[in-house]
């Protein structure tokens, strides 16, 4: 079978490497790809956000399956475009990809369906956000740009001055572009951060092994957050007890909540 991978980063490199090991696959394309991916796939000079061109390419080259690696095209509706053309594609539709594309949506969903999450407030007015920080916030506190920001749109602020500066950076200076039109102000939580990726078919969820991500730019857990400086798997902190709690209160309830909202999720959910 022929496979097309959409993206140009380390994630897509890992997907290409894995797909190349399948005896069922005889041809791999990647758009746009990169020099490392070229070891496993034929790189195609079509941008990840050029949905019509990508779908045309898949049709013309009789691609059997397209795998979307990047968040931006998923949130933009690439799966909808491919499905409308009768093409097989792996990833959530636009109305489900909002789970990753909008932190405010995700927080509201969890609140509505009683899925455990940190206390929060959403703001689309910087003055109201500043007023909240000055009157109700407890520090340290977390500021999150609502939209996609390559994993960098989260600021942990230790005092009011840092938080005020953060609001202005995100909402007024548009440090993260339109991702900062809305902002989530969230309770700061202590503890170990563990990530779990999961396969979802709209109803059933199958989790992968856990992973522990290191987001800070500098050694010693210092500096700003990034999309990830490194990771290891499995995490020793993801115990059987933690897994049982998450399976019961987080994973399946999230899938069920999305279905109840008419946003059936098919693809990979990142917890």
Residue spans of the language-model regions?
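ATP-binding N-terminal substructure of ATP-dependent carboxylate-amine bond-forming enzymes
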Residues: 1-94
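General beta-strand structural signal in soluble alpha/beta enzymes
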Residues: 5, 30-31, 67-68, 89-92, ...
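Short, charged, surface-exposed secondary-structure boundary motifs
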Residues: 38-41, 55, 98-104, 218-220
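Short acidic-hydrophobic, aromatic-tinged amphipathic segments that line or gate anion-handling sites
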Residues: 43-49, 121-125, 157
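A conserved helix-loop-beta module that forms one wall/lid of the active-site cleft
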Residues: 90-153
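Internal nucleotide-binding/catalytic subdomain
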Residues: 153-271
